[in-house]
UniProtKB/Swiss-Prot annotation:
EC number annotated for this UniProt entry: 5.4.2.8
Homology family: Belongs to the phosphohexose mutase family.
Keywords: Isomerase, Magnesium, Metal-binding, Nodulation, Phosphoprotein, Plasmid
Gene Ontology biological-process annotations: carbohydrate metabolic process
InterPro entries in the cross-refs: A-D-PHexomutase_a/b/a-I (IPR005844), A-D-PHexomutase_a/b/a-I/II/III (IPR016055), A-D-PHexomutase_a/b/a-II (IPR005845), A-D-PHexomutase_a/b/a-III (IPR005846), A-D-PHexomutase_C (IPR005843), A-D-PHexomutase_C_sf (IPR036900), A-D-PHexomutase_CS (IPR016066), Phosphoglucosamine_mutase (IPR050060)
Pfam family, one: PGM_PMM_II
Name of the protein described by the UniProt record: Phosphomannomutase
A molecular-function term among this protein's GO annotations: magnesium ion binding
Organism of this sequence: Sinorhizobium fredii (strain NBRC 101917 / NGR234)
Cofactors demanded by this protein: Mg(2+)
Keyword rRNA processing part of the UniProt annotation: no
Class in the EC hierarchy, top level: isomerase
Length: 474
């Protein structure tokens, strides 16, 4: 199976994207922009990238293709996806972000942005159709490396400026924060922003070899490493992100990661959001805990953004969205503490990190205390890697076909009281435990999300769910 659009962007094997596929899709994107009148011939198109080995070459291939299509490519270098999107909004320019986000190192991807933000599902279909039409065009598929004017400093600085005045200069004073740098494009930017608000930042775990970090399914080895750092350095928190810095990672003082949907909820409270858009996989306690209107969507930023756009069209103000991975999106303009935060409808890791740290400082309590204050159902998630797309699709289809199939497969866990198939299949067992399975849209993986009343019950349910799914012969 070749590269295809997943939950956010085009994804595929790096060996496939380093070649004609990237040229083809960059050309198709240019054609869509021109055909729809979103840009004029000769328009600027920004290109950014993460630190994967293949990203620089894919970016160069895309820049050459953009130039052949009549665009003017601008090289923004290695920077966070939200930084690229923000700079694109400032310039009124479309953009391409070369990143595979959190997926394994042998894969990569391309995220596409219109001048006002991330493309939607209809745009993805249009780009795919144009790519099919252009696939036999030698010019559209030509592989050559191009260049663009260097705007890396301008784009990065503009993103840092967004958060410079969000908190007082001493807003994080007194915190000793570990920064797990690995191969995140935000590793130096986070240092600048956190130190700018008074935090003592200690870098750990920097790597020149790409390390995929999935903030929604943190490995046991990574959790052990985080806990060891927290103890060794007496950190108040450890912060990090995935590869392209649109998903945050934040731990408490023990090195225990905070759930991404909790970070989103904290952010919503800090900014006094009036409407939250979030996928069905986010914690079921969000509605009660937030006290505001919550719109549930399918998994994927395009669906969350569509819900925010619809809410703004209805006249709603202070609209924001977040996913279970912690990426926060602002659908409308916000203000906080005298600072303005213009809308940025793409996932961002910095805002939720700052929000949670600031809440801890203001409450004069460790982050573990902030978690306890929110009293959400205990939610965990995991995944089965190298789970073929066709196998996961067949499994979900089998389960959706009849209640008997569901009961047969999950009888060892308990009696299923209800199901929801908005995205994958969500099972509610008698007693209120929840198990949600869905195929990943980005990699050959099967995702499993659970909720229960206490940590032990949640861990047991997750282990049971993964065991059942692993042994399924469907």
């Amino acid at each position: 199976m070749g590269p295809k659009f997943g939950t956010s962007g085009l994804r595929g094997l790096a060996t496939e994207l380093v070649g004609s596929v990237s040229a083809l899709y960059a050309t198709a994107f240019s054609r869509m922009l021109l055909d729809r009148g979103r840009v004029a011939p000769g328009a600027t198109v920004l290109v950014g990238r993460d630190f994967r080995d293949s990203s620089s070459e894919i970016a160069a291939i895309c820049m050459a293709a953009l130039a052949r299509a009549g665009m003017v490519p601008v090289d923004c270098g290695g920077l966070p996806t939200p930084a690229l999107a923000l700079y694109g909004r400032k310039l009124g320019a479309a953009s391409l972000m070369i990143t595979g986000s959190h997926i394994p190192a042998d894969r990569n991807g391309i995220k596409f942005y219109l001048p006002d933000g991330e493309i939607n599902k209809a745009d993805e279909q249009a780009i795919t159709a144009l790519a099919e039409q252009l696939s036999a065009d030698a010019d559209a598929t030509r592989v050559e490396c191009g260049r663009g004017a260097d705007h890396s400093s301008e784009a990065t600085d503009f993103y840092i400026q967004r958060y410079e005045t969000l908190l007082p200069k001493s807003g994080l004073k007194g915190l000793k924060i570990g920064l797990y740098q690995h191969s995140s494009v935000a590793r130096d930017i986070l240092t600048t922003i956190l130190e700018g608000h008074g935090a003592n930042v200690v870098p750990v775990g920097r790597s020149e070899v790409f390390i995929p970090v999935d903030t929604e399914a943190i490995s046991a080895a990574t959790c052990k490493m985080l806990a060891a750092w927290a103890k060794e350095f007496a950190f108040d928190a450890i912060v990090s992100s995935d590869a392209d810095a649109d998903r945050p990672l934040l731990t408490d003082e023990t090195g225990t990661p905070l759930r991404g949907d909790l970070l989103g909820l904290i952010c919503a409270r800090l900014l006094e959001a009036k409407l939250i858009a979030t996928p069905i996989t986010s914690n079921s306690g969000i509605e009660a805990a937030s006290g505001v209107e919550v719109v549930r969507t399918r998994v994927g930023s395009p669906y969350v953004i569509a819900a925010m756009t619809e809410a703004v069209a209805r006249g709603k103000q202070r609209v924001m969205g977040f996913e279970a991975n912690g990426g926060v999106m602002l659908g409308s303009n916000f203000s906080f503490g005298g600072a303005s935060l213009p809308a940025l409808p793409t996932r961002d890791c910095v805002l939720p990190i700052i929000a949670a740290l600031h809440m801890a400082v203001e409450a004069k309590t460790p982050l573990s205390g902030i978690v306890a204050m929110h009293r959400l159902p205990v939610a965990l998630s995991g995944r089965i890697e190298n789970y073929p797309f066709d196998r996961s699709d067949a499994l979900v289809a089998f389960l959706k076909a009849s209640k008997a199939n569901v009961s047969h497969l999950f009888s060892r866990i308990g009696r299923v009281a209800g199901t929801d198939d908005v995205d994958g299949l969500r099972l509610t067992f008698e007693g209120g435990r929840i198990l949600h399975i869905r195929p990943s849209g980005n990699a050959p993986e099967l995702r499993c999300y659970v909720e229960a009343d206490d940590p032990d019950a949640a861990e047991h349910l997750l282990a049971q769910g993964l065991a059942v799914l692993n042994s399924s012969m469907v």
